[in-house]
Amino acid sequence: MRRQLRRQSEQYGNIRPKPADAVLIGAGAGLSAAAGLTYSGERFERYFSDFREKYSITDIYSGGFYPFETLEEYWAWWSRHIFYNRYVDAPVPVYDKLLTAVKGTDYFVLTTNVEHQFQRAGFDKKRLFYTQGDYGLWQCSRACHDRTYDNEVTVRRMLDEQGDMKVPSELVPYCPVCGAPMTMNPTW
């Protein structure tokens, strides 16, 4: 698997755009998978084996839809899901190589990826459009208002303080406007 990811990364790293007025980069889940952000196999086992054993969840994506009994369990899952996909650099430098390939050109990125690896690699934030949201943001589950909220500090605390696949109740995020539980920003 690693050899295949490395080979794919090298292929992406050798792409050189032809002269053009502008470059539009379209990217989906395949780019992140090539960068090593896989949702199954060894990576899933490393971070989520306890959830697999208790709930029979088979991969990271499917776990996002699991009907956990408590918000403490829900946020234990999601804090790991968010952290290991949004706040950790991709293991294979696909995004870095893509940035090198378009450096000095007028580019724009349109992506369905929600883990913001483009920003982590140094792509200009003003040249990115994430059609399906951002793992780094929460929003009201009732949509009582349009604001989103950065979650990094709380996600890191949830990760540090969780035990037995639960976060402490005081870390469960609630909407500051209506009091409903917060939810993820991705819009799938």
Residue ranges and their predicted role:
Residues M1-W188:
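Conserved catalytic core of sirtuin-type NAD+-dependent deacylases
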